[in-house]
A protein has these predicted regions:
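Nucleotide and nucleotide-moiety/phosphate-recognizing core
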Residues: 2-7, 13-97, 107
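Short glycine- and Lys/Arg-enriched binding-loop motifs that mark or flank ligand-binding interfaces
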Residues: 4-6, 10, 127, 141
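Flexible, gly/pro- and Lys/Arg-enriched active-site loops
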Residues: 46-53, 68-71, 75-159
Length: 159
């Protein structure tokens, strides 16, 4: 397998853990070998109000797919598992069965109309960084140069 990819997963509807596990299984079948998987974390919604908490996790995958192919495949998996939309027309977030974010593709920095790498908000989200630190504490943000552990410590110090 050629490239190491980090993905963040979250669900706040239905049987959350089962849905996240099913997404991870499908990723393993279609994107590449799942090398590491974090624990599941119960977190509050970010960027909007909801009574539904999230189940979040992170995984690392070794893949031969291109970044765009990874993105297309995880979006296809989201649709297969019942996710319809992640935002309202006004841009506000909504509850969802599954959300899969491509966080990092082997340290690639990319900014196209369909994909920005690394994920532009990952370093601002505790629910992303906590599971990422569990599986890859020494991962280095390709733009900021800080490790996952340093980024998470910074988020915790902001609070």
């Amino acid at each position: 397998m050629g490239k190491r990819v980090y993905l963040g997963l979250g669900s706040n509807l239905g049987n959350k853990e089962r849905i996240v596990r099913k997404a991870i299984d499908k990723i393993g079948e279609r994107v590449g070998a799942v090398v590491a998987m974090s624990s599941f974390y119960k977190t509050a919604p970010w960027g909007y109000q909801s009574v539904h908490t999230f189940c979040n996790a992170a995984i690392s995958v070794d893949t031969d797919l291109s970044p765009e192919e990874v993105l297309f495949t995880v979006q296809e998996i989201e649709r297969e598992l019942g996710s319809k939309k992640h935002r309202e027309r006004d841009g506000s977030y909504v509850d969802r069965l599954i959300d899969i974010d491509l966080l990092d593709y082997d340290g690639l920095v990319l900014d196209t109309h369909s994909l920005v790498l690394p994920h532009p908000y990952m370093h601002k989200r505790t629910f992303v960084m906590t599971p990422l630190v569990e599986i890859a504490p020494q991962w280095v943000h390709p733009v900021g140069g800080k490790t996952a552990t340093e980024l998470l410590e910074g988020l915790r110090n902001e609070k």
